[in-house]
């Protein structure tokens, strides 16, 4: 049985680091989905340009390349989503909630829906969504973002229950602050950068989940920060 990997958002700040790790693992074929082509190359890599995946027709188009097969187990990791924050509820524009539900929840819903249809006709598979720490532990000034990410967790946990019937496992990672250039600028000089989780480390977590996709399902993997252990 072959194992094929799909990465959505492969060329973003998180996705690029994760992809660099995963392309070195033993997947028979890897599909990289992003709005911009990734520079990573390999004989087993196929790059697929995507549009706005909150649009159902764009999701259908993205998955049109992937063909179901009883000889293939499919794994999908998505980094797609958006962020807004910094305002109390009474100062928050309703459009901010709409945007977060579109970019975080609706996109995840549609990816899960159409990926499940492929897995249903294949040997099995696993999907791993990117949620957020604040989707579990509320923080001030992040209601639209937190609500949307909390909903992604509910989506994954319910899909894990339903997925038993089609040999599909579903999980989420919930990182706190990821070590990206944008987050470093936002945190400023007072931040302990050694505590920030590196995209490449998340890549290893993703691979571990997919290595054990038959037994790990319905799980939220909380990533609160790195332990500051000297190498």
Where do the model's predicted regions map?
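C-terminal helical subdomain
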Residues: 172, 191-231
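N-terminal Rossmann NAD(P)H-binding glycine-rich loop of SDR-like oxidoreductase domains
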Residues: 11, 15-20
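Active-site helix of classical SDR
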Residues: 112, 148
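Alpha-helical segment proximal to the catalytic Tyr-Lys
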Residues: 117, 160-162
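Residue(s) in the substrate-gating loop at a strand-loop-helix junction
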Residues: 132
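Conserved mid-core segment of classical short-chain dehydrogenase/reductases
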Residues: 60, 81-98, 141
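Conserved Rossmann-fold SDR core element
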Residues: 153, 163-178, 215-223
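Catalytic Tyr-X3-Lys loop
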Residues: 90-109, 128, 152
